[in-house]
A protein has these predicted regions:
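N-terminal ligand-binding lobe of clamshell/alpha-beta domains
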Residues: 1-163
Length: 163
């Protein structure tokens, strides 16, 4: 059964839903889901990734909520999972990101679109690897992902693994 009312608790997943052609099914997003810009005009803002407005989400009566282990607060996601269908992604590397895309495609009856996107991503990765020098140096890098407060990538994270 295709999801008709989706709440996305993660900006990157919101963008994925749009890429899969599900823009009209999205009924709720976080205040950090800023792409595509026009999406916020037609959806309900359900708080931030760490401070969800659970009552607003309940009023939306979603048939699917998409969350992420690192982005969202476990207790809030568990409270929603007691009432609604919730998928929580846990992405630490490239292959897990592709697996999440496929899973979201399956959950939303958009598997062909998800598989096409995975193919595009793999092709882009192959093109990048073809031009990357074999003796590429590894540089220490400070990648700031947020300010107020300042936060950077570190440790065993998806972004760190991709870099």
């Amino acid at each position: 059964m295709s999801a008709k009312r989706i709440v996305s608790l993660v900006p990157s997943i919101t963008e994925l839903l749009v890429d899969l052609g599900l823009e009209t099914a999205i009924v709720g997003v976080t205040k950090f889901c800023v792409h595509p810009k026009h999406l916020r005009k037609n959806t309900t803002i359900i708080g931030g990734t760490k401070n969800l407005r659970l009552e607003v989400i309940r009023q939306l009566q979603p048939d699917l909520i998409l969350a992420n282990k690192e982005e969202n607060v476990r207790e809030q996601v568990e409270a929603l999972a007691a009432e609604f269908k919730v998928y929580t992604s846990d992405i630490g590397n490239f292959d897990e990101a592709l697996s999440m895309i496929k899973t979201v495609g399956e959950l939303t009856d958009r598997l062909p679109e998800a598989e096409a996107l995975i193919t595009q991503i793999n092709q882009a990765k192959s093109r990048f690897e073809a031009v990357k020098p074999n003796n590429s140096k590894h540089y220490r890098t400070l990648y700031l992902i947020w300010q107020k407060p300042w936060m950077s990538v570190g440790g065993d994270t998806y972004i760190s693994n991709m870099m």
